């Protein structure tokens, strides 16, 4: 009897966390779960492993957020992190001459990229173009004065800019750091 009274409380809390998320986030997670079922039926081990690792990372992120809303931008950051982990692993495996593991990691990375491309988020090229325009505008505004990167970060409206550009703040920051050296030489 005690078990029955606890059970509904736990399931309601989990649905509340998902209810608090954006529709694109919920759609992406349900797509992953559906594709996991299809991969299990088709016995596609590589796809199954990649999707399970993605769902595991998503679940860990939801636990870390502690009830705060999650959106497609946090998913984009998570997928980017998973891809960079795969790239690091590939480099290590190449150094150790483990071609079998390189092929496995490359396959998983391709699967993650496929899901990353399906998110309603701006591509890296679009982000870089927007950042270049922003940095050019800030450079003309500053004139001949020496500009530091922390001043640029302070000028940006971090509440509205990510939603305008349809990307995560982390992706914007990475692009700013990457392009700052080229523009402010």
UniProtKB/Swiss-Prot annotation:
Any Gene Ontology CC annotation: mitochondrion
Residue span of the annotated presequence: 1-20
Organism the protein comes from: Saccharomyces cerevisiae (strain YJM789) (Baker's yeast)
Main location group: mitochondrion
Subcellular localization, as worded in the UniProt entry: Mitochondrion
Family of the protein in this entry: Belongs to the AIM41 family.
Protein name: Altered inheritance of mitochondria protein 41, mitochondrial
Pfam families linked: YqeY
PANTHER family: ALTERED INHERITANCE OF MITOCHONDRIA PROTEIN 41, MITOCHONDRIAL
Record has Mitochondrion as a keyword: yes
Keywords of the record: Mitochondrion, Transit peptide
Alphabetized SUPFAM superfamilies for the sequence: GatB/YqeY motif (SSF89095)
Keyword Transferase: no
Gene Ontology molecular function: carbon-nitrogen ligase activity, with glutamine as amido-N-donor
Gene name in the database record: AIM41
Domain of life: Eukaryota
